């Protein structure tokens, strides 16, 4: 083992989208509205829990296995919190809530049907679309966020959770320490596009992330560096799986 490897610590991160809501079913833009899980979503949570259990117990080499989950960190919006509570294998484990994992605030577009938003709020919709390439451009309306606003808070939250796991020295540098992050589709898509290196071996991976899908990534931390922004690397291993066997969940 060379010196660089000795200083490298790895934490696996499960990237999970919340279960289906009534707003999802109706095609209404949620943003940071605190919406509830619907009946379909409750069934999705049951399947998610079974898939997480399979990842922890299966001996099938084709499954993205995890030894155990050390931390569960979730957006504090109830659709994510309820999903996190329902997927828990160990009921005694604490769930950490964070507003930093919330969906992007899209200003006046929140609560508007996606099909009619371009007609009802043409300027706001145009700004939202333009902001996908102009990362510093905020959505129109009070509270509207830019892509950079979202990336900044999400990165802070996940890297803080990773560092706390490493500081607790739970799994040494074996790569077996795992945390689960329960968040939103918009957050996951931005994370994937801007923060991670991909290692997906050519699998189809573009598109919408379905509810209760699971992605996996590794966060590598160079413990020899004190520069927090330069000593981490995010590597995406799988994206938006609906089941532990790895059926693609991307449209």
What are these regions (language model features)?
Residues 22, 79-81, 103-104, 187-189:
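Short, active-site-adjacent cap segments at secondary-structure transitions
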Residues 74-75, 152, 182-183:
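Short beta-strand scaffold positions
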Residues 19, 185, 242:
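Active-site metal-binding loops of divalent metal-dependent hydrolases
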Residues 23, 88-156, 250-251:
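Phosphate-handling substructures
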Residues 46-60, 151, 155-167, 192:
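Generic structural signal for well-ordered alpha-helical scaffold segments
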Residues 8-93, 97:
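Active-site-proximal alpha-helix that buttresses catalytic centers in soluble enzyme cores
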Residues 1-12, 104-118, 163-177, 190-251:
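Acidic, low-complexity terminal tails and accessory targeting/binding regions
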Residues 62-100, 122-127, 218-251:
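Conserved histidine-centered catalytic loops in small-molecule metabolism enzymes
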